[in-house]
Curated annotation (Swiss-Prot):
GO biological process entries: AMP salvage
UniProt entry keywords in alphabetical sequence: ATP-binding, Cytoplasm, Kinase, Metal-binding, Nucleotide biosynthesis, Nucleotide-binding, Transferase, Zinc
Name under which the protein is recorded: Adenylate kinase
MF terms in GO: adenylate kinase activity; ATP binding; zinc ion binding
Binding residue positions for ATP: 10-15, 127, 136-137, 200
Written domain comment of the UniProt record: Consists of three domains, a large central CORE domain and two small peripheral domains, NMPbind and LID, which undergo movements during catalysis. The LID domain closes over the site of phosphoryl transfer upon ATP binding. Assembling and dissambling the active center during each catalytic cycle provides an effective means to prevent ATP hydrolysis. Some bacteria have evolved a zinc-coordinating structure that stabilizes the LID domain.
Chain spans, region LID: 126-164
Length: 216
């Protein structure tokens, strides 16, 4: 079973990935992890990628594609894999199709965990931190027991990281939506896209994912 897992930041993709790996026993291939491994192991593509990263430049598609291809050539992917964070654009999607054709494989499903942007902004911008002891809270999921007072140290001074501020979160989501929309259309046309409602409880989301994968 060969999968691609898609979802905007905050959609709960990481949690679903762990559950899929546990039940279906396929490797979770996250681009961040394979980049680090390729650079550490000094693979040909890892060496190329490091040149760009060291200069603070974006790694070109052909190098990213090469790193994914190196990983998909490893033995543990022969019975299936789950890609997470790749492809990020249509050029990478075409490259993935070519890789799979070359190795006599095909993509079985693209699972898209869908959560409305306004819900994601709420999820991602709800985090706040006690300035005194550093304990992290969330306005919706993990608030302080007494409003305005830290459970751990009793402090009253909280702050929000710049990354977690609603405007920053919204901008980050906008960038991701622009990247994801053409990919969603691409995979819809190929007939392999399955969109899952990510606004349900984690268990219900996974139930829907599992149903799709079991019936492939």
């Amino acid at each position: 079973m060969n999968l691609v897992l898609m979802g905007l930041p905050g959609a709960g993709k990481g949690t679903q990935a762990q559950l899929i790996v546990k039940d279906f026993d396929i490797p979770h291939i996250s681009t961040g992890d394979i980049f680090r491994a390729a650079i550490k192991n000094q693979t040909p593509m890892g060496v190329e990628a490091k040149k760009f990263i060291d200069k603070g430049e974006l790694v070109p598609d052909e190098v990213t594609n090469g790193i994914v291809q190196e990983r998909l050539a490893q033995d543990d992917t022969k019975d299936g894999f789950m890609l997470d964070g790749f492809p990020r654009n249509l050029a990478q999607a075409d490259a993935l199709n070519a890789m799979l054709v070359d190795s006599d494989r095909q993509l079985d499903a693209v699972i898209n965990i869908h959560v409305r942007p306004e819900v994601l902004v709420e999820r991602l911008s709800g985090r706040f931190i006690c300035r005194n002891c550093g304990t992290t809270y969330h306005r919706l999921y993990n608030p302080t027991k007494v409003e305005g007072t830290c459970d751990v140290c009793g402090g009253h001074d909280f702050y929000q990281r710049d990354d977690d501020k609603p405007e920053t979160v919204k901008n980050r989501l906008d960038v991701n939506i622009k990247l994801n929309t053409p990919l969603i259309d691409f995979y819809k046309k190929q007939g392999v896209l399955y969109t899952i409602d990510g606004e349900q409880d984690i268990d219900k989301v996974y139930q829907a994912v599992k149903e799709v994968l079991t019936n492939l």
